């Protein structure tokens, strides 16, 4: 895969005699989520593998944070705010150097929590072009019209209709949200699910945040993905999107630029390998040989209490090793629930209000009969009266 510099250089060379200024070169990153892990570590990754790469580009016109700069509401005095603000400051300096526009888009409200407003003051500076976007609106960048769509909960459809269908053509869209056919298609959500029909007035690509796996849907809708990995069960490529958009022909080229990220892996073990010591040696060797940063071991069989204590004590202070032991509690719960369902089917008549107490009693007696000689209600009355 070409790196970002080769990507832009190839576009430049392919342009021939056409003036290179007809192109818009943009970088898109999303779902940064300060402080989902050590914010200093996040900051270092973003500086070395995002900002430093962009600095090497011959041309850079637009940098977009496509939502979820923050993971949750944080205190202004926290390390999360400190390193997030350092990152934004570095981006502002880069954009000043490159004479590029920086757009910071609000993402999911439960993540960003309007905290992107911390950077409103950059919009007052006259030596750099920064736009902090918290509402649906159009922005003009290098004579191109860009539709910006943050994620909202329960926003009236007429608001979307106004910008998507009744405001004329636009050149590209940057957003944060759900697209039909992506991960969250069938998940209950208060935010809107978009389709390609919503973008019939868009004359270029749509680049979005929200889904942590990079991908393309319906040919022109792109997810940036997240820039790094911080949890198990996430083995997707990590990085950001680099785009070159031809404002004359309306064609574009996209590249997913990879960022090296921690490797999270989960393995299953039936039980111990001979004893606790051999199991520990196996875990350590497997992690080292496979260059795994964070390893989770799920024991699918029983492990005796003494061995559990040895394993837990050895890995007690290891954040890079997670042990999950087999438990039959869930199995017992499922069995109990199944028994309840079976009994409710067997004794459904006890809850039938159309039956008399005597009829219910007769049915209960017959349900416990050891033979097929069932009694009737009249027979039971005779037995009770005798």
Please provide the spans of the model-predicted regions.
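N-terminal active-site segment of His-dependent metallophosphoesterases
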Residues: 1-86, 160-169, 374, 385-386
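A short helix->loop->beta-strand "cap" motif at the edges of active sites that frequently abuts
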Residues: 97-102, 201-204
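Conserved catalytic scaffold of divalent metal-dependent phosphoesterases
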Residues: 103-197
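Divalent metal-coordination and catalytic microenvironments
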Residues: 31, 68, 107, 146, ...
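Conserved beta-sheet core of the metallophosphoesterase superfamily
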Residues: 185-250
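Active-site environment of divalent metal-dependent phosphoester hydrolases
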Residues: 33-37, 71-74, 103-116, 139, ...
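Accessory, non-catalytic peripheral segments of nucleic-acid enzymes
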Residues: 2-21, 245-386
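Beta-strand-turn-beta hairpins that frame and shape the catalytic cleft
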Residues: 17-27, 138-148, 167-172, 219-221, ...
């Amino acid at each position: 895969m070409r790196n970002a510099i080769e990507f832009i250089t190839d576009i430049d060379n392919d342009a021939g005699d056409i003036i290179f200024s007809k192109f818009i070169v943009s970088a898109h990153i999303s779902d940064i989520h300060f402080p989902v892990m050590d914010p200093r570590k996040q900051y270092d990754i973003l500086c070395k593998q995002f900002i430093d790469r962009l600095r090497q580009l011959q041309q850079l016109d637009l940098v977009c944070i496509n939502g979820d700069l923050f993971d949750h509401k944080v205190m202004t005095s926290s390390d999360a705010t400190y390193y997030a603000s350092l990152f934004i400051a570095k981006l502002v300096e880069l954009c000043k150097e490159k004479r590029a526009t920086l757009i910071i888009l609000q993402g999911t409200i439960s993540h960003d929590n309007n905290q992107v407003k911390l950077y409103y003051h950059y919009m007052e500076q006259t030596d750099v072009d920064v736009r902090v976007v918290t509402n649906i609106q159009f922005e003009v960048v290098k004579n191109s019209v860009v539709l910006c769509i943050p994620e909202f909960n329960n926003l009236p459809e007429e608001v979307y209709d106004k910008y998507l269908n009744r405001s004329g053509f636009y050149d590209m869209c940057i957003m944060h949200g759900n697209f039909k056919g992506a991960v969250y298609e069938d998940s209950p959500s208060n935010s809107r699910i978009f389709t390609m029909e919503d973008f019939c007035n868009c004359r270029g690509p749509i680049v979005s945040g929200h889904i942590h796996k990079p991908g393309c849907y319906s040919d022109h809708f792109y997810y940036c993905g997240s820039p790094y990995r911080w949890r198990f069960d996430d083995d997707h490529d990590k990085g950001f999107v680099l785009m070159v958009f031809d404002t004359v022909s309306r064609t574009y080229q996209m590249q997913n630029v990879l960022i090296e990220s921690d490797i999270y892996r989960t393995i299953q073990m039936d039980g111990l390998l001979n004893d606790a010591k051999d199991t520990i040696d196996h875990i350590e060797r497997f992690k080292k040989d496979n260059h795994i940063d964070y390893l989770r071991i799920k024991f699918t069989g029983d492990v005796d209490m003494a061995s559990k204590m040895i394993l837990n004590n050895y890995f007690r202070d290891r954040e890079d090793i997670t042990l999950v032991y087999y438990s039959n509690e869930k199995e017992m719960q499922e069995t109990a629930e199944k028994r309840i369902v079976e009994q409710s089917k067997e004794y459904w008549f006890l809850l039938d209000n159309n039956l008399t107490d005597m009829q219910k009693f007769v049915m209960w007696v017959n349900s416990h009969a050891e033979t097929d000689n069932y009694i009737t209600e009249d027979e039971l009355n005779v037995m009770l009266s005798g």
